[in-house]
Design a protein with these regions (language model features):
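Mature extracellular/secreted ectodomains of secretory-pathway proteins
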Residues: 24-169
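Fungal secretory targeting signals
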Residues: 1-27
């Protein structure tokens, strides 16, 4: 009985040690050295204003939007929301440095929009968003791609789903 248990454990360990993933995956882009400071800058840009909670929530959603399983337009939607809140801060006369904060947050949104997204496979490009941004400041900006990608990025047919349209609520 003891020998069969020992053999079972030994065989299981041997099999597990030889197991390897079928595909190398490219994860971790949502916490890269490029984007991590942007999340803090997002929060800092609205600190002390009536928009701190909303922009803080967007900084959390910004992390989520870079995940491989998220829809192709989620990153652009977050950037659109950041520009929306930036313009609101710039127009708010109770914020002494509102125009400066507006400019700063728009620049942060532009930088964020260029951030590389995770992909389900190393060397595979992430999907592009198939709709125009809601604000002209983001026109022509798309996310960076995996430098090891050997194909061009696709635009999925579901990139314009209603749940991915800009809605500032």
């Amino acid at each position: 009985m003891k020998i069969s248990a020992i053999l079972t454990v030994a065989l299981s360990m041997a099999l597990l040690s030889n197991a390897a993933p079928l595909e190398k995956r490219r994860f971790g882009q949502e916490h890269s050295a490029f984007v991590e400071p942007l999340y803090q800058k997002m929060r800092d840009s609205a600190q002390g204003t009536n928009f701190a909670g909303q922009v803080g929530q967007m900084s959390g959603e910004a992390v989520n939007a870079l995940l491989a399983a998220k829809p192709a337009c989620r990153q652009q939607v977050v950037a659109d929301h950041l520009v929306f809140f930036a313009k609101k801060m710039g127009a708010d006369t109770t914020i002494a440095d509102g125009k400066t904060r507006e400019k700063d947050l728009i620049n942060i949104a532009k930088q964020y929009r260029t951030a590389e997204r995770n992909t389900n496979q190393d060397g595979k490009p992430s999907f592009l968003c198939g709709r125009k941004p809601s604000f002209k400041e983001l026109n022509g900006i798309v996310q960076k791609q995996d430098p090891a990608a050997t194909t061009k990025p696709d635009t999925p047919t579901d990139a314009t789903n209603l749940d991915e349209t800009f809605d500032p609520l």
